[in-house]
Amino acid sequence: MNSLLLWLLLLAPPEGFEAQRQRMVDEHIASRGIRDKAVLGAMRETPRHLFVPEHLRSEAYDDHPLPIGRGQTISQPYIVALMSEMLGPGQNLRVLEIGTGSGYQAAILSKLFKEVYTIEILPALAEQAQAVFRQLKLQNIHTRVGDGYQGWPEQAPYDRVLLTAAPPEIPSALIDQLAPGGRLVGPVGADPLAQYLVVVEKDKAGKTRRRVSYPVRFVPMVPAR
């Protein structure tokens, strides 16, 4: 590198979060096959840096998970986009999310669905996520502290269900709360080294069909004690 180019690089202002976010979508999401325009738009608009601990914000737009405390993580951006696309977004649809965590996935879903119902078992994480939802004025997200294995029966049925933590098997309560014609997407597997994204579709008659897709690695889905 010649001295003039080095000097210009040193003088250049640091890349801001907005530019980092657009680069993340271009280099790590769109380039890897995500095509849904609504999903790409949501990923471009949603400030991931607000959902990570302040000391990790410099890594907010890198394509990898980050710890958010209490043994939990915010998922890799590509996986967030992939699962959102696999769900099949729709502005007239209602979605149940199991595992609010940082709130980032719910924020993405809020731009893709009419209503988002999200359950978090750890009260402190739910409170942190709700604070960011309020900051971003995301008024179509409804948060509940509770056991994700039981779902949210009072608001059922749901057109879509998304799991952001991995149970050994898909809880029957979540299948029951899935509307006819609905779809569930989530990681499944007790062994973190042998988890797969699973898609369950329920037809109009209530029969379900299951298919296994990509290998993944998620934190375990923890039941209430």
Predicted regions and their residues:
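Sec-dependent signal peptide recognition
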Residues: 1-7
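N-terminal auxiliary segments of SAM/dcSAM-dependent transferases
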Residues: 7-55
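Solvent-exposed, acidic/flexible segments
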Residues: 17-22, 32-36, 72-80, 98, ...
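Conserved alpha-helix/loop element of class I SAM-dependent methyltransferases that forms part
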Residues: 26, 31, 56, 60-93
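Structured segments of extracytoplasmic/periplasmic soluble domains
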Residues: 27-32, 42, 46-49, 86, ...
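Conserved nucleotide-cofactor-binding alpha/beta core module
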Residues: 88-209
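Short, solvent-exposed aromatic-acidic interface loops
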Residues: 212-222
